[in-house]
A protein has these predicted regions:
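TPR/TPR-like (Sel1-like) alpha-helical repeat modules
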Residues: 77, 81, 85-112
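Alpha-helical segment of the N-proximal tetratricopeptide repeat
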Residues: 6-38
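Structural marker of alpha-solenoid helical repeat scaffolds
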Residues: 4, 38, 72, 89, ...
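Structural signature of tandem alpha-helical TPR/SEL1-like repeats
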Residues: 22-30, 56-68, 90-102
Length: 125
């Protein structure tokens, strides 16, 4: 096994993105494990790894990885949204709603706002 260089890690990260796009979360995880081991502080790699766990229906590892990203980047709207989806799939709807609402507050993308399920405005009395 050869040593991981910055170049090979970038190649592995890009290949993992391609594998995830091709719906191969296991293949992506194999590559991302190397990248995260070499650079545990890299939130982009951790976010991609969390997505791979989610797509592979490994909800607990996905949750932990999304939480790690949010500890480092508490204003990452996508990470809040994805953690919300993960919790929703695990049938933890109240926890999910909190993260959906944080995502929508940070970035009012339609899918974030829709997931947040805000109460409709009340008509004036």
């Amino acid at each position: 096994v050869s040593e991981a260089t910055p170049e090979t890690l970038v190649i592995e990260f890009r290949a993992a993105e391609q594998l995830l796009d091709a719906r191969d979360p296991r293949g992506a995880l194999k590559l991302l494990d190397t990248v995260v081991a070499a650079h545990p502080e890299n939130t982009a790699a951790r976010l991609l790894r969390a997505r791979a766990f989610f797509l592979g229906a490994q909800l607990r590892p996905a949750e932990m990885e999304f939480q790690t990203v949010l500890e480092r980047e508490p204003d990452n709207a996508f990470a809040h949204f994805a953690l919300g989806r993960t919790l929703q799939r695990a049938n933890r709807k109240d926890e999910a709603r909190r993260h959906f609402r944080l995502a929508a507050a940070l970035d009012p993308r339609p899918e974030f706002v829709e997931a947040a399920d805000f109460d409709p405005p009340r008509p004036p009395t």
